[in-house]
């Protein structure tokens, strides 16, 4: 008994073992107590992906293209002319490339540029990385505004920095609701009537900087919003250019949301007078009267608060997992993990015939998984790929612990302390090289925006790092303390 207490004392006073214990405690607190989440069952605060709780994913493509061009004119003149000819927003990307925020085929653009005395050099359907970041932020704001939980939004950007797709994963959301939330993109624009039924684009939704709550004026519901300084200046210039300031009745201001008209009326005399003197930032979009008008105002507010997407999108792919199937997959994953640990325990015992090796090995492996989950809860949803990563961490972890055990043992006994430490350092060297290889192999998968194996790579890398830095050294000290009571060879 005294010998066992002495062994435990050696183990629990070693600083490397204490670090692992502290990390395990912090991880458990993170999963179940910060914030309190005991009512959520075994998953606690872990972020479960749609594979495990049910939900939907939607992949969107962009009705836009990034082109490279050659032209003798300045870029500002080129953009102005191209924007007028296409009636679309044209945004500079580099000194020789632009983003066109409407869909045109390569042949159509070659013809248009030829008419301008320019040449089309490259053509890529998609948007610039900067616009992609804007779209991602807008979608995140939109789904957060709607109260949707557990959302993952990732973009797929190629080596040429052109983003072709954005993928939205909404856990706990059915496919119809997901499509309504995501594909209803709130593309807002203001146009002005030039003559007859002809209109010209004035500005798009990214000029909207703030939005008020729905309010009633003269029994009509509407949403007030504020334009940026550039947007207000563009509105004033257009109203003066097309005569809306001097003849407002002939030049309605038209507001469109997703191509549908939500407001059309001439400038008020008060607004016309203000515009003649300077830019006006505060405007209002009327949505009608009664309950329908109020509901439309609420929808408009949501889209404007989230920010209107600068480009049109279309659904390129979608799928869903039912909540029942998600629960079934959770059960299968838990069962697989338990069976895996039991199988590992059996094989380790069969190899060493020594319970004092099996128990520490399994406990160290479990502590590694707990620490990994405690960290992953902040940075990674647990989907099937992530679960596969956890199982891989269990397997590679046991492999490395076996390497340590085989290296330090001599005929089942611990050698002298100096020889033990020498062999232990050699084992850690082997493990570190192996871990480095794994990390470098997984990095490309972890850095790919839309890779379905991204979760697998992230979990595997984290698990390997936790093992090499914390749990492997602790295991070495535990084994040394437990088996040191055996006679040295």
UniProtKB/Swiss-Prot annotation:
Sorted UniProt keywords: Cell membrane, Membrane, Protein transport, Translocation, Transmembrane, Transmembrane helix, Transport
BP GO terms, sorted: intracellular protein transmembrane transport; protein targeting
Superkingdom assignment: Archaea
Gene Ontology CC annotation, any one: plasma membrane
Pfam families according to UniProt: SecD_SecF_C
Transmembrane feature ranges: 17-37, 328-348, 356-376, 384-404, 428-448, 450-470
Assembly and binders: Part of the protein translocation apparatus. Forms a complex with SecF.
Family stated for the protein in its record: Belongs to the SecD/SecF family. SecD subfamily.
Name of the protein this chain belongs to: Protein-export membrane protein SecD
Organism lineage: Archaea, Methanobacteriati, Methanobacteriota, Stenosarchaea group, Methanomicrobia
This protein's encoding gene: secD
């Amino acid at each position: 008994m005294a010998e066992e207490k002495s062994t435990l004392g050696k183990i629990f006073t070693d600083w490397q073992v204490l670090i692992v214990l502290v990390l395990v405690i912090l991880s458990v607190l993170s999963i179940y107590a910060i914030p309190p989440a005991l009512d959520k069952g075994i998953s606690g605060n872990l972020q479960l992906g749609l594979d495990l709780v049910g939900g939907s994913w939607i992949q969107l493509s962009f009705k836009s293209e990034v082109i490279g061009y050659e032209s003798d004119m300045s870029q500002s003149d080129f953009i102005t002319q191209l924007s007028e000819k296409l009636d679309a927003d044209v945004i500079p990307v580099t000194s020789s490339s632009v983003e066109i925020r409407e869909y045109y085929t390569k042949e159509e653009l070659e013809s248009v540029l030829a008419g301008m005395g320019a040449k089309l050099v490259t053509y890529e359907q998609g948007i610039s990385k900067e616009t992609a970041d804007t779209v991602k932020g807008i979608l995140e704001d939109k789904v957060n505004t709607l109260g949707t939980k557990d959302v993952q939004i990732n973009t797929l950007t190629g080596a040429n920095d052109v983003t072709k797709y954005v993928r939205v994963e909404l856990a706990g959301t059915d496919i119809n609701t997901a499509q309504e939330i995501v594909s209803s993109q709130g593309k807002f624009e203001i146009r002005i009537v030039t003559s007859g039924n002809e209109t010209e684009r004035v500005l798009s939704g990214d000029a909207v900087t703030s939005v008020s709550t729905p309010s009633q004026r003269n029994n009509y519901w509407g949403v007030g919003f504020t334009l940026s300084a550039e947007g207000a200046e563009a509105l004033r210039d257009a109203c003066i250019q097309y005569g809306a300031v001097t003849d407002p009745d002939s030049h309605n201001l038209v507001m469109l949301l997703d191509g549908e008209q939500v407001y059309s009326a001439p400038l008020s005399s008060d607004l016309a007078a203000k515009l003649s003197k300077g830019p006006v930032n505060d405007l209002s979009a009327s949505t009608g009267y009664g309950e329908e008008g109020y509901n439309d105002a609420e929808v408009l507010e949501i889209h404007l608060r989230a920010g209107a997407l600068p480009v049109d999108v279309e659904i390129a792919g979608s799928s869903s997992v039912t909540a029942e199937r998600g629960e079934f997959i959770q059960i299968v994953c838990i069962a697989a993990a338990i069976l895996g640990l039991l199988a590992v325990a059996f094989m380790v015992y069969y190899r060493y015939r020594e319970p004092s090796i099996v128990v520490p090995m399994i406990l160290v492996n479990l502590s590694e998984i707990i620490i990994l989950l405690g960290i992953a809860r902040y940075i990674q949803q647990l989907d099937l790929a992530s679960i596969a990563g956890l199982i891989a961490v269990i397997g590679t972890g046991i492999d490395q612990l076996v390497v340590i055990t085989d290296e330090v043992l001599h005929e089942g006994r611990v050698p002298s302390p100096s020889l033990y430490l020498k062999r232990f350092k050699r084992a850690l060297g082997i493990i570190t090289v192996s871990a480095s290889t794994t990390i470098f192999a997984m990095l490309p998968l972890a850095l790919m925006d839309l890779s379905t194996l991204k979760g697998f790579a992230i979990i595997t890398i984290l698990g390997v790092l936790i093992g090499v830095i914390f749990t492997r050294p602790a295991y070495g000290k535990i084994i040394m303390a437990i088996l040191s009571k055996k006679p040295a060879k």
